[in-house]
């Protein structure tokens, strides 16, 4: 009985299935953890959602920013961008079923026995675990309610960017959403910077990756996250696992088997496309 953690799939269905075959993943016996951003950019978002949903209790996932954007498109709030390749999913006969299932998925996964936490972008150093749990529940409750389009319409924006227990209403929900799904860099006090997307070596001072700022969750738990493909899975402290390795950009899809910390990778099929283009 193994636990497999896989980074951002981004619609790369064929690579996901190949990787699961490589590690001999067995639903019902093994458990699959997914860092979110199941959809967009790759060609198989519909197949990814259908497959992941079919796994039932054998999968534990968290929502990413692209998953939330898909929900906003589905609700008629955001524009369907051709580069996201979401039209087959949005026009599928089971789209309502899939997307209503998706919006009821969590922002945070915790395994107390393994001392393991997963969130798409990570855990802000301004939160302890109890605060993270409460904040995740706040957004999850709205997403699973009938008023979820109202929240999705208001979630876009970079402010507020500093946590306070006094935050209320849509500002509170927006900060929580950004912390769980968009965060990369912070100021030394933990305040979010929502503009920089480069690698840590290229970031302007005084910005630091969120995981480079001491926080109470990382003192007691391992943290697995995706979202940040330019890290290429490297440069994190012990106990912090960056799993997005840019499959949809021609990189790889990465899997970590938790029990022995062994990594497995599946090259992106885009390598074939790029190679064929270069040869032609």
From Swiss-Prot:
Classification via InterPro entries: ApaH, Calcineurin-like_PHP_ApaH, Metallo-depent_PP-like
Gene3D superfamilies assigned to the protein according to its UniProt record, in alphabetical order: 3.60.21.10
Broad enzyme group: hydrolase
Catalysed reactions, semicolon-separated: P(1),P(4)-bis(5'-adenosyl) tetraphosphate + H2O = 2 ADP + 2 H(+)
TM segment ranges: none
Keywords: Hydrolase
Biological-process GO terms, alphabetical: nucleobase-containing small molecule interconversion; response to X-ray; RNA decapping
E.C. designation(s): 3.6.1.41
Keyword Cell cycle applies: no
Activity regulation, free text: Co(2+) is a strong stimulator (100-fold increase in rate of hydrolysis). Mn(2+), Cd(2+), Ni(2+), Mg(2+) and Ca(2+) are weak stimulators; the two latter act synergistically with Co(2+).
Any one of the GO CC terms: cytoplasm
A molecular-function term among this protein's GO annotations: phosphatase activity
Role description: Hydrolyzes diadenosine 5',5'''-P1,P4-tetraphosphate to yield ADP.
Family in the record: Belongs to the Ap4A hydrolase family.
Quaternary structure and interacting proteins, as annotated: Monomer.
Name this polypeptide is given: Bis(5'-nucleosyl)-tetraphosphatase [symmetrical]
